[in-house]
Amino acid sequence: MKRALLLLAACGAAEAPRAAGPVSVPSTPADAAIDTVIDAPPIDAPAPVAAAPADQEVWLKGSTHVHARASGDSTESVEGVIGWYEARHYDFIALTDHNHVTPPEQGHSLIVLAGSELTFNPSGCLPEGDKSKKCRIHVNALGVTERPVGKIEWANRHTHWRLDMYQAAIDECRHLGAALIQINHPQWYWGMTGDLLAAIAHRGALLVEISNIQFTTWNQGDADHPSMDTIWDDALMRGATIWGVASDDAHEYVDPHGKWPAGGGWVVVKARRDPRAILSSLAAGRFYASTGVVLTRAEPESGELVVEVGPDERGSYVIEFVENGKLADRVVGKSARRAIPQNGYVRALVTRDDGAKAWVQPVRR
């Protein structure tokens, strides 16, 4: 957690080894945003829920992957999108239209962060994915300061290597003045590996979607492909600093059974109710990801990782501590804690009896 601040310049970083393997890819996006945004460079932490003082850190619920009409694959207006999240008591969202930055629009209670989903759908990527040869390089630039007009052209079309393609996206994030980089649905059509994710993190990405509710099968993996949790642990064991996000990748806001409906995955950030503070807390890993579980504590304290489910939350819960890629403890109940190891990391996964989950970020000494 302490090391995360060193990477707050989310869009820049060092060189890393190249991953190997091959994958193919056609073209078809699925990530974007809307038309309302608040300028928000990086820096800072926490926010409130009711009416807490402006300087008080509170838990803030938000989505870092949202689409609107400007994305090309959603029919909802920006106003409609903002209204949907406001009505459900979200505190913030990031507008991430495909290869487009929507100019900021203010005057809403919902904090709207400017962003873009850099989208490239080539074929035949390396490492390989499945036999379809489809490949999806989708990267969110969050909290951008630049406002390019029209479509952003950024893709490296002269390589088949995923790492080089991701590097092109990271470079574009720098050009856009992004505060954070998020890797979206990395297992879509497979191809992501722990060493590749670690290399991408080393080059500047701080967030990765562990759970994208539109891609459940890809998140969970199968007999031939690792889950995103497994890939995340692999990257963490290689020393990477990268935080796990849950998102709805929303495109549909009217029909809950439509294609890519809103809701179902989000992050809850400990920060002040301020755009820069929210971005700073995301960069520092001061948040948990959720598909329905509500936590009141998810933080290190006195050398331990402490996890507590809200006292009024219904259902039964299992809290699992994963230490250096292996299940270290399993507690049935609403609260648990585990000592932070001298070497490596520990993270937690909370599962409710209905299948809803919360991912607590890894901590190190």
Task: Please report, for each region that a protein language model flagged, where it lies by residue.
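N-terminal low-complexity, Pro/Thr/Ser-rich intrinsically disordered segments
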Residues: 25-64
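Sec-dependent signal peptide recognition
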Residues: 1-7
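N-terminal membrane-anchoring alpha-helices
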Residues: 17-20
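C-terminal functional module detector
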Residues: 40, 45-56, 71, 78, ...
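A metal-dependent hydrolase metal-coordination microenvironment
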Residues: 52-198, 203, 210-227, 247-253, ...
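Bacterial signal peptide processing site
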Residues: 12-15
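Alpha-helix boundary recognition
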Residues: 86, 174, 236-237, 283
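Functionally critical loop-and-helix segments that line ligand-binding/catalytic clefts
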Residues: 227-236, 274
